[in-house]
From Swiss-Prot:
Transmembrane segments: none annotated. The gene is NUP37. This is Nucleoporin Nup37. Signal peptide: none annotated. One of its GO terms (biological process) is chromosome segregation.
Length: 326
């Protein structure tokens, strides 16, 4: 391994707007390209990208915009629906956004004439996280600074409502058992809810605040990761409600934590935009130091490719992609 893990982005894509959030589609979409969505001050853009790591005849990255959706307000979060398919006739693009006006918008498009959106209203403060139920895609969970986690159906009706003790920062759905939901709070508590019984069944404590982001490891659902204060933290929920591992990473406070979709030992973190740049790091649990470090002028958002050890971050009028090894 190289001594210096710092490096520039492997690939970049120019965008027409500052990128606040970016998300690879985490679900199989029936097509060879990888769907990606990013949001700026006014728009959500849906595109496909293919990388040389997966297609021999591609040089670097091949990117194509499929559709731009007018949003009218800053986009803060994006979640893909598992109902999205590129191989159906017509194709189905389905995703939802959270925005600065405290509303969730559910978009459906066939990439031709049908472009619909529905507004889900109810949160009374900033929405920090949202996610579709990964099996059927018939429900959306969201968490907010208003100290609630809410479950919505696709008609915009709230089907469940959990009162939190502090702002809700992240929400994740169990990939197989869709009645299990993980909610992370800013006060350092991570709770698992049983949606059938509508009650908490387990909780973890970070012992550090503020907890800014947490993520359930989809390769091993006994693992949960988070960033709180300057540190990353990892729990094994079968062993303790306190972290098994933790390490300081970002001097200017850590911001986001995301597990890789292909390895239970690989994860990425970002720091808050500092005076000069946002720090981005990829970590491997077998290595004491980050295996890759990058810096983005004004970075926000963080997402892993579904099948490659590749991350994307949004920046000033661009998307930046980093590649690592598993």
């Amino acid at each position: 391994m190289k001594q210096d893990a710092s490096r520039n982005a492997a690939y970049t894509v120019d965008c027409e707007d500052y990128v606040h959030v970016v998300e690879f589609n985490p679900f199989e979409n029936g097509d060879s390209g990888n769907l990606i969505a990013y949001g700026g001050n006014n728009y959500v853009v849906i595109g496909t990208c293919t990388f040389q790591e997966e297609e021999a005849d591609v040089e670097g990255i091949q990117y194509k915009t499929l559709r731009t959706f007018h949003h009218g307000v800053r986009v803060d979060g994006i979640a893909w629906s598992p109902e999205t398919r590129l191989d159906s006739l017509p194709p189905v693009i389905k995703f939802c956004t959270s925005a600065a006006d405290m509303k969730i918008r559910l978009f459906t498009s066939d990439l031709q004439d049908k472009n619909e959106y529905k507004v889900l209203e109810g949160h009374t403060d900033f929405i920090n996280g949202l996610v579709f139920d990964p099996k059927e895609g018939q429900e959306i969970a969201s968490v907010s600074d208003d100290h609630t986690c809410r479950i919505w159906n696709l008609e915009g009706v709230q089907t469940a409502h959990f009162v939190l003790h502090s702002p809700g920062m992240s929400v994740c759905w169990h990939p197989e058992e869709t009645f299990k939901l993980m909610v992370a709070e800013k006060n350092g508590t991570i709770r698992f809810y049983d949606l059938l019984a509508q009650q908490a069944i387990l909780s973890l404590e970070s012992e550090q605040v503020p907890l800014m982001s947490a993520h359930w490891c989809l390769k091993n659902t006994f693992k949960v990761g988070a960033v709180a204060g300057n540190d990353w933290l990892i729990w094994d929920i079968t062993r303790s409600s306190y972290p098994q591992n933790k390490r300081p990473v970002h001097m200017d406070r850590a911001c986001l934590f995301r597990w890789s979709t292909i390895s239970e030992n690989l994860f990425a973190t970002t720091g808050y935009p500092g005076k000069m740049a946002s720090q981005f790091q990829i970590h491997h649990l077998g290595h004491p130091q980050p295996i890759l470090m990058g810096s983005v002028a004004v970075g926000s958002g963080l997402s892993w490719h579904r099948t490659l050890p590749l991350c994307v971050i949004g920046g000033d009028h661009k998307l930046l992609f980093w590649v690592t090894e598993v």
